[in-house]
């Protein structure tokens, strides 16, 4: 028996006999470009490049910056609150809230920045509402996860202590987060 089928741009020829079976897998000629593109994307997502720690920032605020320096860059926040950190961590967490931007600091140093406001750009010029092609052109292919229609591209920094995370819905950036790894 000989069967031929096409799945996702690939032709599969399958020969079945009493001795066993043999399969020949080959791309459909018209789909060669798509297959090559998918292979490049797959290999790139398996090994995302590490970002230099100095590239982790939004709106002129960088990780490790003092709260006072962040306030000088951003101006007076709409809300400024300080709460005790979890007992296992200790210390205090201070959160500065602006229109579509949140800056969190532990013991006076910025450790988390997130935005949904296109006014605030990453250090490399990516902003909310940019298309995913700009993200990939700027940062390459990050580690990907999908949940509820939102694709999360994660780029670790070279010290593996913090990440740049871009949440994409459709083909547009919806949220940008710079901070510790998220679960």
Question: Which residues are covered by each model-predicted region?
Answer:
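Signal peptide processing junction and immediate N-terminal pro/mature segment
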Residues: 15-38
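Bacterial Sec-dependent N-terminal signal peptides
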Residues: 1-3
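Bacterial N-terminal signal peptides
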Residues: 5-15
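Glycine-rich loop/hinge motif
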Residues: 124
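A cross-family detector of function-defining hotspots
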Residues: 41, 46-47, 51, 55-57, ...
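A low-complexity, Ser/Thr/Gly/Pro-enriched, surface-exposed linker/loop concept
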Residues: 111, 117-120, 132
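A generic structural signal for short
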Residues: 55, 120-121
């Amino acid at each position: 028996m000989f069967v031929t089928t096409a799945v996702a741009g690939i032709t599969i020829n399958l020969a079945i006999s009493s001795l066993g079976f043999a399969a020949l897998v080959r791309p459909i000629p018209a789909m060669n470009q798509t297959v090559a593109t998918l292979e490049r994307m797959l290999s790139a997502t398996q090994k995302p490049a590490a970002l230099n720690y100095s590239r982790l920032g939004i709106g002129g605020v960088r990780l490790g910056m003092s709260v006072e320096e962040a306030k000088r860059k951003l101006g007076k926040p709409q809300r400024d609150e300080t709460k005790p950190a979890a007992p296992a961590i200790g210390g205090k967490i201070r959160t500065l809230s602006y229109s579509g931007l949140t800056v969190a600091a532990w013991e006076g140093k910025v450790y988390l920045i997130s935005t949904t406001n296109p006014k605030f750009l990453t250090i490399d010029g990516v902003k909310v509402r940019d298309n995913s092609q700009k993200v990939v052109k700027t940062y390459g292919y990050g580690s990907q996860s999908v949940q509820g229609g939102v694709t999360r591209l994660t780029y670790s920094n070279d010290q593996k202590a913090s990440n740049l995370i871009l949440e994409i819905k459709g083909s547009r950036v919806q949220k940008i987060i710079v901070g510790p790894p998220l679960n």
